[in-house]
């Protein structure tokens, strides 16, 4: 509670609760209510399993956005990742939150184990089913296009490129214009993108503070029990600017720097997210002319999709 209060007092506006599963913490209802009372905009990332009808009724008012993990298109494929008997419960929770008026999204990360020749059709059927049950209310569907490392598993760039192509085909099967819409949705009007988000504060369950939500790959900059929130907020701003496209090589001289924002500071930079053990200047190491040309084409195609000219 004190951390949230201090965050707000130092200019904080948005907070995301994740885990694990936030509802595993018994005082979560009091925490989300307190965040709402402070005027913070709250997002919750949940696996969807612990929500009762009463909890949804009691807490929906305090939640600005909720995202559920659903890593398959049905019970069979979801159980390969999340365990058996969970799929219908999560779908039901998704529908109830959307119908309660909360901005609701469904995040899906397929694995090679549960992808098959029928995934495109079955995923579209799932999307259509949820839309039908939510009476036209906006539910946002997100497909992860990158396999992140974890549990001693690491993926090569070539593997992720292959995976991304498969996922984009699934998206296109659901909505042939998805790539255009995703591009423009990721670029807010009149907002200059200078960073991937490095510098945003992530507080782990033990109070350690990181400046990216991929905390297992980052360094801690201290603990909220030992340093004031003002310190972390100032340090986060400092890191955000130091690693912005205006200050890294070769991005600072690229005409596309405010469109691509430089990419991930863990995956695409020489310091791999490890600020404290790295020295200036920082370098983007994954960009090339082929990627630039693809980005230019995607930008132009998206623009032409939304704006028609005689």
What are these model-predicted stretches?
Residues 1-62:
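Conserved alpha-helical substructure of the radical SAM core
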Residues 6-9, 60, 135, 248, ...:
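Alpha-helix termination/capping residues and helix-transition junctions
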Residues 7, 12-17, 199-203, 207, ...:
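N-terminal pre-triad scaffold of radical SAM enzymes
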Residues 20, 48, 71, 146, ...:
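Flexible loop residues that form catalytic
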Residues 26, 85, 249:
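Residue-level signal for the nucleotide or nucleotide-sugar donor/cofactor binding architecture
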Residues 60-65, 69-71, 76-210, 214-224:
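Radical SAM enzyme [4Fe-4S]-AdoMet core and its adjacent flexible, acidic
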Residues 214-310:
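Flexible mid-to-C-terminal extensions adjoining Fe-S/redox cofactors in radical SAM and related proteins
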């Amino acid at each position: 509670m004190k951390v949230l209060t201090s965050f707000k007092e130092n200019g904080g506006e948005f907070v995301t609760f994740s885990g694990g599963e936030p509802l595993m913490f018994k005082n979560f209802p009091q925490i989300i209510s307190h965040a709402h009372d402070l005027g913070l905009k709250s997002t919750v990332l949940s696996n969807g399993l612990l929500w009762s009808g009463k909890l949804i009724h009691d807490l929906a008012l305090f939640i600005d956005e909720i995202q559920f993990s659903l890593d398959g298109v049905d019970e069979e494929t979801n159980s390969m990742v999340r365990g058996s008997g969970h799929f219908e419960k999560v779908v039901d929770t998704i529908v109830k939150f959307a119908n309660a008026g909360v901005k609701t999204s469904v995040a899906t990360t397929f694995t090679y184990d549960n992808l098959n020749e029928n995934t495109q059709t079955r995923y579209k059927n799932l999307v259509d089913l949820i839309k039908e049950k939510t009476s036209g209310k906006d539910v946002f569907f997100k497909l992860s296009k990158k396999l992140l490392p974890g549990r001693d598993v690491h993926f090569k760039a070539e593997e992720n490129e292959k995976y991304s192509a498969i996922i984009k085909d699934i998206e296109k099967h659901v909505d042939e214009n998805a790539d255009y819409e995703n591009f423009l949705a990721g670029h807010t009007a009149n907002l200059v993108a200078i960073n991937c988000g490095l510098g945003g504060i992530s507080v782990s369950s033990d109070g350690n503070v990181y400046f990216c939500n991929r905390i297992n790959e980052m360094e801690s900059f201290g603990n909220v029990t030992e340093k004031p929130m003002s310190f972390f907020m100032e340090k986060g701003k400092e890191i955000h600017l130091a690693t912005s496209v205006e200050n890294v090589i070769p991005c600072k001289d690229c005409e596309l720097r405010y469109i691509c924002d430089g990419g991930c500071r863990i995956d695409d930079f020489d310091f791999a997210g490890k600020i404290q053990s790295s020295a200036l200047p920082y370098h983007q190491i994954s960009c090339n002319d082929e990627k630039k040309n693809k980005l230019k084409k995607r930008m132009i195609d998206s623009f032409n999709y939304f704006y028609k000219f005689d």
